[in-house]
């Protein structure tokens, strides 16, 4: 082949024809392939491809109208396709296109300005900066003792941050303290999806209301995000086991206010999903919090943080809340009774303790829960427990 033909490839002007492959070759190997003008040419070529696909879709939509038309032949479609390809090239170059090329030019120009254009090796610069920090003779440093940690130093928070540095779950980062838990964190969490924290809780808790001993009402119907610990496992294998474990402890606490202990257990079952969604501490241990009581200003004991969804005026608001943590479930029952006795707004409920269903209704009226069916659900669970106990006393295993 004549060498003059080879030298002419990519050197001629842009013909503007879609069949001219030399103009595409010039974009790749031409003298100005790194120039600003070439960026616009590449953007226009991309826009022409987009326009061509758009024209194809428009043609295919009209094929149904061409059925039975003797001029709708394969030859006609071939020339029509050639026309559309040339039309897309001409529109992107001469008529200003649809603006897609202009957007690409702005984006590619910013990328080009931010890139290193001096041809220097970035790794060489790193090596120069790090040369003074590393010893030239590693064996000379082998005999030196490592620095001892400071006395009383607590690195647990830093370790938690390091442990949760890789996961992309923002909820887990907030629980580790990487993101502040103050009110700005709640605004940052607004971008999260409704179910973005659900994988951390295999069994969603029932609708409930958080409490605070300092008199500030907190909205219920929340769901809690916890650190990913032993998913799918529960402390209780069945509802019967939950009842058998909780009922003796609930009886001691119920005697203080004269209410039926079954209703306290039923309430704990509704709050925790039969023990499957009890709030956990950061180290994975159980908080034994059966009623979702928050710490409040008067609480000086241990606490467990959790990402909750509160409902304010019908709108879901995500926030990090601190909940009371107990050493046992029995302590949770007694603290719940003390909580009711220490708040005047629940006095009507305490006065109705002899009638457990009325007791739950008065709790709901006092703002204990936002769920309008809360008292009915607790009573239904309590009656179901009574049936289980009657069947067990008869020596017949309960159904289901």
Curated annotation (Swiss-Prot):
It comes from the Bacteria. The keyword Cell wall biogenesis/degradation applies. Its EC number is 3.2.1.-. Pfam families: Glucosaminidase, Rod-binding. Residues 112-155, 204-229 are annotated as: Disordered. GO terms for cellular component: periplasmic space. GO terms for molecular function: amidase activity; hydrolase activity, acting on glycosyl bonds. InterPro entries: Flagellar_prot_FlgJ_N, FlgJ, Glycosyl_Hydrolase_73, Lysozyme-like_dom_sf, MGlyc_endo_b_GlcNAc-like_dom. Residues 238-400 are annotated as: Catalytic. This is Peptidoglycan hydrolase FlgJ. It comes from Pseudomonas aeruginosa (strain ATCC 15692 / DSM 22644 / CIP 104116 / JCM 14847 / LMG 12228 / 1C / PRS 101 / PAO1). The gene is flgJ.
């Amino acid at each position: 082949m004549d060498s003059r033909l080879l030298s002419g490839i990519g050197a001629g002007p842009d013909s503007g024809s879609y069949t001219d492959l030399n103009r595409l070759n010039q974009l790749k190997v031409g003298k100005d392939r790194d120039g600003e003008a070439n960026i616009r040419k590449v953007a226009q070529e991309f826009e022409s491809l987009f326009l061509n696909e758009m024209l194809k879709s428009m043609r295919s939509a009209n094929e149904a109208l061409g059925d039975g038309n003797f001029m709708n032949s394969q030859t006609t479609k071939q020339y029509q396709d050639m026309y559309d390809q040339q039309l897309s090239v001409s529109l992107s170059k001469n008529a200003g296109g649809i603006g897609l090329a202009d957007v690409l030019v702005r984006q590619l120009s910013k990328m080009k300005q931010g890139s290193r254009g001096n041809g220097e090796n970035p790794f060489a610069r790193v090596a120069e900066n790090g040369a003074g920090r590393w010893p030239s003779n590693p064996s000379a440093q082998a005999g030196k003792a490592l620095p001892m940690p400071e006395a009383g130093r607590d690195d647990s928070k830093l370790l938690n941050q390091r442990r949760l540095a890789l996961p992309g779950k923002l909820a887990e980062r907030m629980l580790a303290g990487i993101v502040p838990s103050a009110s700005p964190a709640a605004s940052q969490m607004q971008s999260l999806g409704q179910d973005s924290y659900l994988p951390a809780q295999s069994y969603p808790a029932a609708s409930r209301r958080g409490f605070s001993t300092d008199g500030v009402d907190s909205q219920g119907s929340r769901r809690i995000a916890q650190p990913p610990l032993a998913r799918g496992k529960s402390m209780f294998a069945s509802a019967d086991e939950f009842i058998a474990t909780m009922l003796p402890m609930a009886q001691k606490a119920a005697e203080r206010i004269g209410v039926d202990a079954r209703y306290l257990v039923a309430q704990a079952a509704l709050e925790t999903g039969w023990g499957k969604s009890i709030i956990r501490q950061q180290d994975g241990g159980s908080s034994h919090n059966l009623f979702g009581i928050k710490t409040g200003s008067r609480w000086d004991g241990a606490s467990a943080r959790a990402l909750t969804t509160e409902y304010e005026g019908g709108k879901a608001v995500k926030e990090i809340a601190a909940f009371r943590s107990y050493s046992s479930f029995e302590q949770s029952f007694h603290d719940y009774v003390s909580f009711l006795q220490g708040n005047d707004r629940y006095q009507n409920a305490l006065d109705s303790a002899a009638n457990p269903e009325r007791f739950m209704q008065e709790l709901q009226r006092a703002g204990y829960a936002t769920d309008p069916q809360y008292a009915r659900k607790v009573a239904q669970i309590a009656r179901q427990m009574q049936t289980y106990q009657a069947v067990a006393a008869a020596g017949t295993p309960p159904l289901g």
